[in-house]
Regions:
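Alpha-helical interface subdomain recognition
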Residues: 1-84, 103-108, 115-120, 144-149, ...
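Short glycine/proline-enriched turns and hinge-like loops at secondary-structure junctions
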Residues: 68-70, 134-137, 160-164
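N-terminal glycine-rich flavin-associated loop
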Residues: 85-107
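A generic local secondary-structure boundary/capping motif
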Residues: 112-114, 130-131, 139-141, 155-159, ...
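A short, Trp-centered hydrophobic/proline-enriched beta-strand micro-motif
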Residues: 119-130
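Cytochrome P450 C-terminal beta-domain/meander region
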Residues: 134-152
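Flexible, small-/acidic-enriched active-site or ligand-binding loops
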Residues: 137-139, 157-158, 184-221
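A short core secondary-structure module
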Residues: 152-191
Length: 374
């Protein structure tokens, strides 16, 4: 991100860039894929991230975090986008940390937030039930049962769901309102099925069959569950847009390097005007995306009530541009861009998957129109 960073944010970016380049380059994602890693990430790398304080960037200091805000989370995720780092950071340290911070009781915060901050436990958010993202379509039921609840339903494509130690599940309650519930994935009646996504990540489909929950599993009964869920998802969208920005920047950078080096017809292909025009177009698209992502993250930190419009715009733009950048990268690499030996294809695959998660560009465009009164 090219806006003026504070000294602390600059140090975070430099640290993230150095660590991820060394410990989680694109070649590491390839190894995870080839090994068929069931969790989809390296626990050793995740532990190191916790030791550096990254996992607690949106968690208050009183619960073991560093409370640097969503801009800091976006800085980390932008660098993750550059190396395609597969980690539970978005799922656990952003989505679930936000749910607990703003929806949890004091007891829930004290019990769970320190575990997220250290990386001791991994949390995953289970919302979607269909192939496409739609947070309003929730049929999973949490039926009142004495002092507790009975949970039944299914969730699809739960990011990091297969390796999670705890789930936060969105379910519809008896009065048709939405509640967020803390659920132990090892409880009786839960079945997790590993899925392989196109980007070599490992989401899970999860079935809940009359799962018994204690009354304190519900995040803060006084909260409006729908409003809390909107905040949680928006935090994830803004930070995911930062990852998509990093992906788009890296795909563009690699492509620019390639066309400057590749010889064809006795000259560098970067000298061809047609490719120069395409590269210039990509540069302007990436720069516009950066502006939107920066605005969305800053608004989320400084004026959260005004953030939803900017977040929807940023997610829509980042989805479109990350797909454009990675697609153009393959085209300008030519035939080798289609081969598995070249890493550029991994960027294209991640762009497809990240674009669908938490809402694609069509969703974002519709959301912008809705929030603008159309």
């Amino acid at each position: 991100m090219s806006y003026i960073l504070s000294e602390e944010e600059q140090m975070l970016r430099d640290s993230a860039q150095a660590f991820l380049t060394e410990k989680s380059p694109v070649s590491e994602l390839r190894r995870l894929r080839d090994e068929g890693c069931k969790d989809g990430f390296r626990h050793a790398i995740w532990k190191e991230m916790g030791e550096m304080g990254w996992n607690g960037v949106v968690i208050p200091e009183e619960y073991g975090g560093v409370d640097m805000g969503y801009t800091a989370a976006g800085i980390i995720l932008q660098e993750m986008g550059r190396t395609l780092a597969a980690t539970p950071f978005l799922a656990s340290s952003v989505l679930c940390a936000t749910a607990l911070r703003y929806g949890g009781t004091d007891g829930q915060k004290s019990e769970h937030l320190p575990k997220i901050a250290t990386g001791e436990k991994i949390y995953a958010l289970a919302v979607d039930e269909k192939a496409r993202h739609n947070a309003k379509h929730i049929e999973t039921r949490a039926t009142k049962d004495g002092n507790g609840f009975r949970l039944s339903g299914q969730k699809r494509f739960v990011v990091c769901g297969n390796g999670a130690d705890m789930l936060i599940v969105a379910a519809r309650m008896d009065d048709e309102s939405i509640g967020l519930f803390l659920v132990d994935p090892e409880a009786d009646g839960i079945e997790r099925t590993l899925r392989r996504s196109v980007d070599s990540h490992a989401p899970a489909n999860i079935n809940f069959d009359d799962v018994k929950l204690d009354g304190d599993a519900l995040l803060s009964e006084t909260e409006d569950g729908s409003a809390l869920l909107d905040l949680v998802l928006d935090s994830g969208r803004a930070c995911l847009a930062a990852e998509q920005l990093g992906l788009a920047e890296e795909a563009f950078s690699r492509t620019l390097d390639y066309i400057k080096e590749r010889d064809q017809f006795g000259q560098k292909i970067g000298s061809f005007q047609g490719l120069q025009h395409r590269a210039a177009h990509l540069l302007t698209e990436v720069e516009m995306t950066q502006s939107l992502v920066v605005k969305a993250l800053r608004q989320l930190d400084e004026a959260p009530s005004q953030a939803p419009l900017w977040i929807a715009a940023a997610k829509a733009k980042a989805t479109k541009v990350s797909r454009l950048s990675s697609s153009e990268a393959i085209q300008m690499h030519g035939g080798v861009g289609m081969t598995d030996e070249y890493e550029i294809g991994f960027f294209y695959k991640r762009a497809q998957a990240a674009g669908e998660y938490l809402g694609d560009d069509a969703w974002g465009t519709s959301r912008v129109a809705e929030l603008s009164g159309f």
